[in-house]
Amino acid sequence: METLKSNKARLEYLINDMRRERNDNDVLVMPSSFEDLWELYRGLANVRPALPVSDEYLAVQDAMLSDLNRQHVTDLKDLKPIKGDNIFVWQGDITTLKIDAIVNAANSRFLGCMQANHDCIDNIIHTKAGVQVRLDCAEIIRQQGRNEGVGKAKITRGYNLPAKYIIHTVGPQIRRLPVSKLNQDLLAKCYLSCLKLADQQSLNHIAFCCISTGVFAFPQDEAAEIAVRTVESYLKETNSTLKVVFNVFTDKDLQLYKEAFNRDAE
């Protein structure tokens, strides 16, 4: 295969490869802009089943994703702690963090979001890491013989992300308010399972997304309180030296986490 030197050419190759795989013989006029090409590629990658993939495809995908991802990297050492020297609150794109592990809010099927171009964290992490993550997750599910339970944690490589690893956890889904004690405990269990797994793997740092607060509808204020309380208790009780980043995306979540730490200091 001729070496593809531009990310635009790589996108076109990957799109054509996935269309061939789907037996899609319709005439396609390739979009002219990189953004439109990316959206087409991402949508196809999102809905692609966890099937074997060629070495050629992986080589092109990895060259493109690693190049795109290294253009936007946030190093943990550039962040300022909010408490002590090991707890951080940071607003930004978790997929840009150069860190030992980021946490993905997965669903029970555990294959990543399969809705084309959906803007949930599960979709974005899988898209930017590469198809290998879906294949790894599928193998985890195959070996355990059932869907992933709420509150557990599993680890995969980060592949093309700046993060070395991805820790996947399934949070509770809220269908009615107020949130039950069971669902509060299950959310806390998500954080505990991720922390324990990180320590078992001898990781130095971990970044949490806001688990269950998206389509799973856990109230953001309650979720922030549970996250902060659970992490602080774990670090204190275990004497863990893990550095923990609470990653937020919205201004509202940033404010809620700051308020949670302010209340904790009172």
Curated annotation (Swiss-Prot):
Reaction catalysed by this chain? 4-O-(ADP-D-ribosyl)-L-aspartyl-[protein] + H2O = L-aspartyl-[protein] + ADP-D-ribose + H(+)
Give a yes or no for keyword Hydrolase in this entry. Answer: yes
Pfam family membership, one: Macro
Primary enzyme class: hydrolase
Q: What is its EC number?
A: 3.2.1.-
Relay the cofactor remark from the entry: Binds 1 Zn(2+) ion per subunit.
Domain of life according to the entry: Bacteria
Q: Which UniProt keywords apply?
A: Glycosidase, Hydrolase, Metal-binding, Zinc
MF annotations from Gene Ontology: hydrolase activity, acting on glycosyl bonds
Q: Name the cofactor(s) required for activity, per the record.
A: Zn(2+)
User: What does the sequence similarity comment in the record state about its family?
Assistant: Belongs to the MacroD-type family. Zn-Macro subfamily.
Q: What does this protein do?
A: ADP-ribosylhydrolase that specifically reverses the SirTM-mediated mono-ADP-ribosylation at an asparatate residue of GcvH-L, by releasing ADP-ribose from the target protein. May play a role in the regulation of the response to host-induced oxidative stress.
Query: What is the protein name stated in its UniProt record?
Result: Protein-ADP-ribose hydrolase
